[in-house]
């Protein structure tokens, strides 16, 4: 083995030697690889972070990345020219306030062991930021004492804990949360301390507050900090009563005062400030004091002495009374006054000084005052000039003497009646003041006691859909207006009077009245037309009269506007849709006046006026249009809403509101029902189906266009030609009952139209009989035993009742239970079910009847009869009053004694104990008038228009009625007594009127035909179910 290895080694050496000997020795690789390095994030925040280092190399190499501490970050073998990436490298967080850095370098070593090095890559880590301070230090600087109590409060007035009147030493430091605080110094014995609170703002950091204490009885030393007065200079001379501006350098909360006057708050900016103070009206030196707060909140003051001199007095100044000045109101017009004054320039003042050359305009009597030295003679004149603006001595001497007096108080007063020189109205005159015969002053005045030119009021419409105007409607002289109306004057050039040539000798060539100011419109109601002052020929007096009685007043109009044809226009509102104020009332005739006004309040009323009447209410449809007038089978409970069969159309009427303009000429009133135009007269409602209908009418207006404001009384109607339905739930058809027993009866009624009105239950022993005779021994008529009305118009009704079964002695057979239902439209239905009633064993005899009678009110009864008789037994038959409550009360009086019967039925061959039966019930009844019942029955079976209607199955309806309506006239229950006894007397009062009709209530004044009963009947029954009856006819 060893030999072979040695041989192989020798062979290799020989081979190499052989190659070298051929002259082809290879060149050695000495070129280092090129490598670069980069980092994905060179700047990291202070917290822990990470970076990714990557780079490129141009040949196959081993790449090693290290940090500046020599620690290897990663080693990567790159097979060929390409890129490399190190895994993410964690960077430790920086806890210092300065930033730190870490540098990285990559080396690449190729196969020939050549090494290339990249440039250095640095990663910076930011330092930790210092947190914003939240506290500040307040230093207490005590001047004059070594310690003192203090109180510290925050901005909300809350005491800082531990510092409520707590003693601290000089230069004490107190750490508190940043903010605004107030420091109050406490008392120190023997020392005078600060008397004000100190505001300290610690929001921006530490502050010091200085608290100055001085020994009692010593002068307070000059505080730290100062304020300097810049102007006025020391010793400046100013006039007493004048205003002086004081300027100073920077301070806070500065106030200025002069002597002992009230302080004035100064205006302060960032570098300086000022305040304006009024110096006293006296002579001598005064002190101006300026005080404020320094930068640390301490009080700082400065003073300045100035000299005050007496202002020169100008005597002879004429001043009008302040309470007579004619000022402007909130509407921009001069206030009302009979006398007064106002300063006006009238074009002679200048823009540079608008108060120059102002005249005092006066009207009425004006009070003046003039200042003059005491003890001097004061003469007052009213002068006119003769060509120059200032009166000459001759003008003065020729003037009117207003007053001549020796001045005592220094101020003299006088009055001037501006109407004394009427021919000089609008011309400048002069109040001349002459003092001691030598000093002369002048005050020009202009009297103006006349109003402007008369306006002429006119009316026109406003451009909106609602407004309308009818001038001189139907030659009535009235203008009718709907909605707002525009009031104006056609004269845009109204001038004040007197305007024109001045009298000879005046200082003005032209008169100069105060000038036109405004127009206002006044509406005087018809209730004031007889006011005599409205006929005043003086237009100014007439203006006062108009204002005293007008009820609608427009706002003043100061400008004529842009449309010359409608100058000085103003809108007067009316009606609910108008939002314009003021508003006129409907159906009131007004006179429209215009009043013009000048600059001193003189007013002129228009010589003419317009008559206007406002109407914003449309016509009214009166009464009902259609009404049910068919009483068959029964009247409608709501004849103006619920219609059946025949209705009567009256079409109502239409009228404009009282005082309105009237109906639009040529318009007629038409109505429609179900799309059909309807005419006055009878109307068969069977032409229409049964739903609800709205009565339509054409678009009517009055002459101004106001639409109808009310619909017909019955704007909606319900056509109901369908009979109600009814069926029995109990008793069971063909059920068998013993007489005297209780039969439970229940019927259900419904109506899909106007609703159920009432249900009545009857028992009957005859069926299919229509002769209306009363048979014996059975009654043979339907006899009512229960009734129920529905008052709320319900669509369904259920009636539960009990009936004590009745049967003749030894009788057995069918009894017919009948339910009669009437709906609110007057339609009716009868339903019948039959049961079998057998006489009870003890039902062997009928109750015995006592005497009975029907007699007039306050008459005596004549009891007659003791059997089943129906006749006028004693000739006292009553005649009913069918137009209202009857004056004849029918009193039914009877005395019935039940029989003591013996039970003859012996089913077991033995004699049983006799059973005594008692009277159970005595009932009073009125028989439905036979003639009227025959009409109803014939109507239901033959003549009802509904039987020919296209909206019902006429054949089925006829068959149904044919089966149910073939019955005799029913007996209507009037009252009963239900106490079991061996005998019973029963009295009952009746008004004779059939309650199928009488007592029906309607929401209108229409009456319903009333019908009386044609018989009064009584039925007496016992506990065994046997019965007797009696009756008395009623005279027709």
Curated annotation (Swiss-Prot):
Keywords of the record: Cell wall, Cell wall biogenesis/degradation, Disulfide bond, Glycoprotein, Lipoprotein, S-layer, Secreted, Signal
Annotated compartments: Secreted, Cell wall, S-layer
BP GO terms, sorted: cell wall organization
Signal peptide annotation: 1-17
Disulfide bonds: 74-86, 256-275, 642-754
PTM summary: Glycosylated; contains six glycans. Acylated in the N-terminal region.
Superkingdom per UniProt: Bacteria
GO cellular component, one term: extracellular region
Any further remark recorded for this protein: The hydrophilic C-terminal region rich in aromatic amino acids could be engaged in interactions with nucleic acids, and the bound fatty acids and the N-terminal region could serve to anchor the layer to the outer membrane of D.radiodurans. The HPI layer contains about 30% beta structure and virtually no alpha helix.
Function: Shape maintenance, possible protection from noxious enzymes or exogenous and unsettling DNA, and may mediate homotypic cell-cell contacts.
Protein's name in the database: Hexagonally packed intermediate-layer surface protein
Organism field: Deinococcus radiodurans
């Amino acid at each position: 083995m060893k030999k072979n290895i040695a041989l192989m080694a020798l062979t290799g050496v020989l081979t190499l030697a052989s190659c070298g000997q051929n002259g082809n020795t290879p060149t050695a690789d000495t070129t280092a690889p090129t490598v670069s390095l980069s980092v994905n994030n060179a700047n990291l925040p202070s917290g822990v972070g990470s970076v990714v280092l990557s780079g490129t190399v141009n040949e196959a190499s081993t790449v090693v990345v290290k940090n500046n501490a020599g620690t290897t970050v990663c080693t990567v073998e790159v097979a060929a020219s390409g890129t490399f990436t190190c895994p993410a490298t964690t960077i430790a967080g920086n806890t210092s306030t300065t930033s730190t850095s870490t540098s990285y370098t990559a080396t690449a070593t190729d196969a020939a062991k050549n090494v290339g090095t990249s440039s250095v890559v640095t990663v910076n880590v930011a330092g930790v930021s210092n947190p914003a301070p939240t506290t500040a230090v307040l230093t207490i600087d005590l001047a004059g004492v070594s310690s003192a109590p203090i109180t510290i409060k925050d901005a909300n007035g809350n005491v800082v804990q531990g510092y409520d009147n707590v003693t601290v030493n000089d230069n004490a430091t107190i750490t508190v949360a940043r903010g605004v605080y107030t420091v109050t110094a406490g008392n120190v014995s023997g020392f005078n301390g600060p008397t004000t609170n100190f505001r300290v703002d610690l929001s921006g950091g530490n502050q010091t507050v200085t608290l100055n204490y001085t020994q009692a009885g010593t002068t307070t030393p000059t505080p730290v900090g100062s304020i300097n007065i810049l102007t006025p200079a020391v010793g400046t001379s100013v006039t007493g009563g004048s205003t002086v501006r004081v300027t100073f350098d920077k301070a806070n909360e500065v106030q200025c005062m002069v002597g002992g006057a009230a302080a004035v708050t100064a205006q302060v900016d960032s570098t300086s400030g000022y305040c304006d103070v009024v110096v006293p009206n006296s002579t001598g030196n005064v002190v101006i004091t300026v005080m404020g707060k320094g930068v640390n909140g301490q009080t700082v003051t400065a003073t300045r002495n100035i000299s005050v001199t007496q202002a020169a007095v100008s005597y002879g100044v004429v001043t009008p009374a302040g309470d007579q000045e004619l000022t402007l109101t909130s509407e921009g017009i001069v206030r009302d006054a009979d006398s007064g004054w106002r300063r006006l320039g009238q074009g002679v003042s200048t823009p540079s000084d608008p108060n120059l050359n102002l005249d005092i305009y006066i009207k009425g009597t004006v009070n003046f005052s003039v200042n003059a030295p005491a003890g001097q003679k004061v003469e007052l004149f009213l002068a006119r000039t003769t060509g120059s603006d200032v009166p000459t001595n001759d003008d003065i001497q020729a003037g009117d003497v207003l007053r001549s007096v020796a001045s005592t108080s220094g101020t003299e007063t006088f009055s001037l009646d501006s109407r004394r020189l009427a021919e000089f109205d609008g011309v400048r005159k002069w109040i001349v003041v002459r003092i001691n015969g030598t000093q002369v002053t002048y005050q020009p005045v202009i009297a103006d006691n006349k109003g402007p030119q008369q306006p002429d009021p006119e009316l026109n419409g406003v451009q909106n859909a609602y407004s309308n105007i009818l001038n001189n409607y139907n030659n009535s002289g009235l203008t009718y207006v709907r909605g707002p109306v525009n009031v104006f004057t056609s004269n845009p050039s109204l001038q004040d009077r007197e305007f024109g040539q001045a009298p000879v000798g005046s200082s003005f060539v032209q008169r100069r009245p105060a000038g036109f100011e405004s127009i206002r419109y006044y509406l005087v109601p018809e209730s004031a037309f007889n006011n005599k002052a409205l006929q005043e020929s003086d237009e100014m007096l007439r203006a006062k009269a108009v204002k005293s009685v007008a009820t609608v007043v427009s706002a003043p109009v100061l400008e004529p506007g842009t449309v010359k044809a409608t100058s000085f226009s103003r809108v007067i509102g009316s009606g609910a849709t108008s939002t314009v104020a003021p508003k006129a009332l409907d159906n009131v005739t007004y006179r429209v006046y215009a009043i013009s006004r000048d600059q001193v309040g003189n007013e002129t009323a228009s010589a003419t006026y317009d008559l206007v009447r406002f109407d914003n209410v449309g016509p009214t449809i009166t009464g009902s249009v259609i009404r049910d007038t068919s009483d068959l089978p029964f009247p409608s409970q709501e004849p103006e809403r619920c219609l059946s069969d025949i209705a009567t159309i009256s079409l109502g009427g239409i009228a404009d509101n009282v005082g309105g303009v009237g109906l639009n000429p040529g318009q007629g009133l038409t109505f429609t029902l179900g799309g059909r135009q309807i005419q006055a007269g009878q109307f068969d409602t069977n032409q229409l189906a049964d739903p609800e209908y709205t009565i339509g009418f054409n678009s009517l207006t009055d002459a101004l266009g106001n639409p109808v404001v009310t619909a017909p009384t019955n704007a909606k109607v319900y056509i109901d030609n369908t009979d109600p339905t009814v069926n029995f739930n109990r008793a069971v058809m063909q059920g068998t009952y013993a007489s005297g027993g209780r039969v439970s009866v229940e019927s259900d009624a419904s109506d899909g139209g106007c609703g159920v009105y009432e249900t009545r239950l009857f028992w009957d022993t005859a069926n299919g009989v229509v002769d209306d005779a009363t048979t014996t021994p059975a009654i043979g008529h339907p006899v009512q035993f229960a009734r129920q009305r529905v008052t709320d118009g319900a669509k369904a009704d259920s009636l539960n009742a009990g009936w004590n079964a009745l049967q003749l002695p030894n009788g057995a057979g069918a009894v017919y239970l009948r339910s009669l239902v009437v709906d609110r439209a007057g339609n009716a239905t009868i339903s019948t079910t039959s049961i079998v009633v057998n006489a009870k064993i003890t039902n062997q005899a009928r109750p015995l009847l006592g005497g009975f009678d029907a007699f007039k009110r306050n008459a005596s009864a004549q009891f007659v009869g003791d059997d089943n008789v129906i006749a006028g037994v004693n000739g006292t038959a009553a005649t009913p009053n069918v137009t209202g409550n009857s004056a004849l009360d029918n009193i039914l009086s009877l005395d019935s004694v039940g029989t003591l019967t013996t039970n003859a039925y012996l089913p077991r061959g033995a004699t049983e104990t006799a059973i005594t039966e008692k009277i159970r019930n005595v009932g009073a009844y009125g028989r439905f008038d036979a003639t009227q019942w025959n009409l109803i029955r014939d109507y239901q079976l033959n003549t009802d228009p509904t039987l020919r209607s296209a909206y019902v199955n006429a054949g089925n309806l006829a068959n149904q009625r044919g089966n149910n309506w073939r019955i005799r006239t029913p007996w209507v229950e009037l009252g009963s007594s239900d106490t079991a006894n061996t005998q019973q007397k029963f009295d009952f009062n009746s008004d004779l009127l059939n309650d199928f009709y009488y007592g029906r209530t309607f929401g209108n004044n229409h009456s319903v035909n009333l019908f009386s009963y044609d018989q009064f009947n009584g039925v007496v029954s016992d506990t065994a179910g046997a019965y007797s009856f009696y009756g008395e006819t009623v005279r027709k």
